[in-house]
């Protein structure tokens, strides 16, 4: 298994102006000493070719793999032109992932009022199918992330249905260890492992002695071990504490479990 960072872990630090992508690449290499990063769209200053090549060159020089690029999107729009715009957005971000050398593009199914999910579902499926055809030409996997907060994919049930309905080898999962709302989140994670091309390691609350207080990491690592997961496991700290202090603490905690479960 490969340990990396999701740039969202430093989102508040980015917003304050104290962090940018170039600086964070150096932090990953020199302080966190990790080999991978997935980049949230808002943390890229632009999609201009010269800038993207600059980021790719710096990442390569620092021996950092850009494991995924993660735009925000939401399919299932009422207006045809709005849905086409979402598809075009994902096509453009597929190009960005290709330029950066990222094998995965994290996408969402989207959000809509729960009472409209069934009605809008075919639009979501068709749009992802269209995006997958384009991604296949670029050799980029669309890694769908189940997300809470009223999305189409609150649980593994809807997530598996989407994978079945889209039915593309270029569509897999960006499996987040903290997003499923199933009654048994750990059973859902275990069932999802065969479809995971990339993962987010969610950290919400760390104790002063470095324990995650909301998630059972022994159960999570047992699932990872049994699945023989070898992809990137990128830490996404979403706690309320200072990111500059608690992201490194998150890596210390996860490294203890990597050692305990012999997941090097």
PLM region descriptions:
Residues 1-99, 136, 168, 172, ...:
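N-terminal pre-domain/capping segments
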Residues 40, 108, 202, 236:
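Conserved residues at the C-terminal ends of beta-strands
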Residues 97-117, 138-147:
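Active-site groove signature of glycoside hydrolases
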Residues 19-23, 51-54, 83-91, 120-128, ...:
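Charged helix-capping and loop-helix junction motifs
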Residues 30, 36-37, 67-69, 126-222:
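Acidic/histidine-rich catalytic cores of soluble enzymes
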Residues 33-34, 97, 102, 196, ...:
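A structural motif
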Residues 232-239:
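Short acidic/histidine-rich active-site segments
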Residues 64, 102-103, 140, 227-231:
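A short helix->loop->beta-strand "cap" motif at the edges of active sites that frequently abuts
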């Amino acid at each position: 298994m490969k340990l990396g960072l999701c740039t969202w872990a430093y989102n508040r630090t980015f917003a304050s102006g104290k962090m940018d992508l170039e600086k964070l690449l150096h932090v990953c290499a020199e302080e966190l000493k990790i080999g991978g990063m997935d980049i949230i769209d808002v943390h890229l200053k632009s999609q201009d070719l010269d800038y993207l090549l600059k980021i790719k060159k710096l990442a390569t020089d620092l021996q950092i793999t850009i494991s995924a690029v993660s735009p925000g999107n939401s399919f299932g729009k009422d207006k045809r032109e709005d849905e086409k715009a979402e598809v075009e957005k994902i096509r453009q971000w597929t190009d960005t992932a290709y330029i950066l050398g990222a094998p995965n593009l994290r996408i969402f199914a989207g959000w809509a009022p729960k009472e409209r999910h069934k009605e809008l579902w075919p639009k979501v499926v068709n749009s992802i199918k269209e995006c997958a055809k384009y991604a296949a030409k670029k050799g980029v996997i669309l890694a769908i992330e189940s997300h809470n907060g009223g999305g189409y994919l609150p649980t593994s049930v809807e997530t598996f249905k989407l994978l079945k309905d889209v039915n593309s080898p270029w569509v897999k999962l960006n499996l987040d260890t903290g997003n499923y709302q199933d009654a048994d989140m750990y059973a859902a994670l275990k069932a999802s492992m065969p479809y995971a091309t990339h993962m987010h390691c969610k950290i919400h609350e760390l104790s002063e002695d470095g324990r995650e207080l909301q998630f059972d990491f022994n159960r999570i690592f047992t699932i990872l071990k049994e699945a023989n997961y070898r992809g990137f496991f990128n830490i996404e700290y979403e706690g309320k504490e200072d990111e500059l202090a608690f992201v490194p603490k998150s890596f210390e905690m996860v490294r203890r479990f990597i050692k305990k479960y012999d997941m090097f």
